[in-house]
């Protein structure tokens, strides 16, 4: 334990570590969360052509949007949808453009496009919510089931796989609860989901020197001949790497959650994720989805840390270790679209390469003849990969010692 604390203090004393943690915090928490809520994502706009020209009033817009959504009764039924669309059209007709910003028009418009494609007027430049006849918006859940079946058929997910996904979907409670959806859509679709990609860069920079740095600083001989032995030193460094990973995650996640609670509170936590993507099959509410996404990032980051430490022990060069580590994550992301679908799914099992947003998808793996929904594997395999890398990292050091 004493060696661990020494290595831990040694790591945190490095200026590059402090700079990386600060930059990561500023990028993800300040820009990616606080300013995104208050300005970039939810600040009101003077017109619908503004992108980054939003006003600095996101908190007020979010609270107004939540209050407006509550006026529709809490359950999503045909009547609720008709009322939402009718109310939007009335506000638009009255020229109440500022009031339109507090509606869930983007989410509702995606529902209309998915469930009522026959009502789309291709000659009309406006969004569907602006012109569809509310009285024709009936059979919401029957249409959703039909769209889901058609999607599975088109995706080639038939037979046993289709039935397996239906078994998962039957656990989804209906009718759906309805509150303000857009905030949760942004939170789960990008804010939390992008955390792993951000952490990968800074973990690569910090941990690449954990073992390789000893050769760079010409202290490898001292490390390998210390009275504690290379084995204990290696274990202390490995524990330090994992501890730093958890600490960085905790700093970012806790800060982001505090920001989320300040701006959004807990309103809408019990809505199903189907409000974001209708054909999702996961029986999860928003809170459960957020917990999954954070767990995905944490376990993936631990797995990635294991890979970085293995490369650092084997390569013994800071720069090369960093490049190889980043290639592990960003390389598959860049080439995935050019690969066969099954190979894309396999690459998703690499730590931090896959996406926590797979909970919105219907991807499955078939292992030894048994179907497994992809989110189950995406949260377990990456951390196992990182842990399995540790014996090889220690072995690399032992070979050098010999």
Description of each model-found segment:
Residues 1-20:
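Aromatic- and glycine-rich beta-strand/loop motifs that create alpha-glucan
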Residues 21-25, 319-332:
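Central hydrophobic cores of alpha-helical transmembrane segments
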Residues 26-83, 92, 133-214, 235-314, ...:
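Secretory targeting signals
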Residues 136, 344-398:
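Alpha-helical transmembrane segments of multi-pass integral membrane proteins
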Residues 224-230:
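Short helix-to-coil transition segments within interhelical loops
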Residues 227, 238-243, 324-352:
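Hydrophobic alpha-helical transmembrane segments of integral membrane proteins
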Residues 401-402:
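Conserved small/polar residues in nucleotide/adenosyl-binding loops
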């Amino acid at each position: 334990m004493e060696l661990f604390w020494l290595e831990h203090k040694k790591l945190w004393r490095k200026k590059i570590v402090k700079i990386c943690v600060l930059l990561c915090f500023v990028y993800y928490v300040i820009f990616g969360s606080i300013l995104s809520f208050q300005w970039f994502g939810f600040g009101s706009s003077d017109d619908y052509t503004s992108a980054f020209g939003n006003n600095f009033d996101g908190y007020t817009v979010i609270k107004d949007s939540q209050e407006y959504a509550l006026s529709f009764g809490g359950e999503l039924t045909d009547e609720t949808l008709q009322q939402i669309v009718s109310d939007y059209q009335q506000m638009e007709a009255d020229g109440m453009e500022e009031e339109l910003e507090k509606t869930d028009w983007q989410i509702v418009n995606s529902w209309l496009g998915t469930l009522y494609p026959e009502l789309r007027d291709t000659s009309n430049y406006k969004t569907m919510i602006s012109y569809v006849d509310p009285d024709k918006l009936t059979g919401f859940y029957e249409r959703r089931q039909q769209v889901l079946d058609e999607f599975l058929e088109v995706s080639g997910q038939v037979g046993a796989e289709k039935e397996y996904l239906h078994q998962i979907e039957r656990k989804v409670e209906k009718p759906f609860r309805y509150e303000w959806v857009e905030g949760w859509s942004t939170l789960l679709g990008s804010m939390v989901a992008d955390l792993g990609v951000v952490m990968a860069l800074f973990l690569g920079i910090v941990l690449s020197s954990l073992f390789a740095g000893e050769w760079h600083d010409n202290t490898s001989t001292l490390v390998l001949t210390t009275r504690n032995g290379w084995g204990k030193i290696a274990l202390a460094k490995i524990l330090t790497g994992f501890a730093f990973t958890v600490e960085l995650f905790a700093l970012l996640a806790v800060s982001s959650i505090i920001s989320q609670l300040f701006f959004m509170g807990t309103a809408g936590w019990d809505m199903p994720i189907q409000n974001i993507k209708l054909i999702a099959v996961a029986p999860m509410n928003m809170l459960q989805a957020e917990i999954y996404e954070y767990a995905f990032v944490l376990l993936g980051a631990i797995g990635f840390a294991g890979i970085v430490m293995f490369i650092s022990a084997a390569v013994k060069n800071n720069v090369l270790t960093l490049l190889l580590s980043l290639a592990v994550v960003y390389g598959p992301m860049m080439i995935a679209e050019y690969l066969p679908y099954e190979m894309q799914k396999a690459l998703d099992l690499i730590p931090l390469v896959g996406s926590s947003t797979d909970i919105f998808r219907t991807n499955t793996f078939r292992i030894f003849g048994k179907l497994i929904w992809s989110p189950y594997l995406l949260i377990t395999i990456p951390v196992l990969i990182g842990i399995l890398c540790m014996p090889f990292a220690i072995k690399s050091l032992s070979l050098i010692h010999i």
